Amino acid sequence: HEKRYSDTILTLSDTYEAGHSLFIVDEKKANDWMLHPDDDLWRGEKGLSNPCPCGYRLHTEKEWRALLSLGYEVKTSPEGFYYLSIADGQLLLPAAGLRNAYTGNFQHIGTRGYYWGANAISRGTSACIDFNKDDITTNISIFGFRAFGRSVRCVKDNQ
């Protein structure tokens, strides 16, 4: 779940409250961490499984697009890691990589960034933003399978 280096388990959850803090490995490639996916879990502050603290929520797809319209660039830190600079450095997103849903392994740490959005697109997928050092284009993707461990960026919920 929310702990970056948590141990793994091979059993998908029956409910949105998994009852443990283990990363659920989706060995059957259902593309979700739940047996019965729920597209409304992260909707705003009052979402059942909102990964953000009280009073905060994830960006919507529309909000991610608005941020990217301010201009962005993939840059390198002095330590050699990559990050996305939006609006001339007003927002920095580290290339934190992701946790592979099918193996539980970490991938692309320091070279690619993967951030969740609040919008469910279809069964097992949600909006997300992806960027990497090799491809200057940064995009909003509809192929964010919810079983993968991606970073979150929480924003104050003014709704």
Segments (PLM) and residue ranges:
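C-terminal, surface-exposed recognition/capping segments
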Residues: 3-4, 14, 24-159
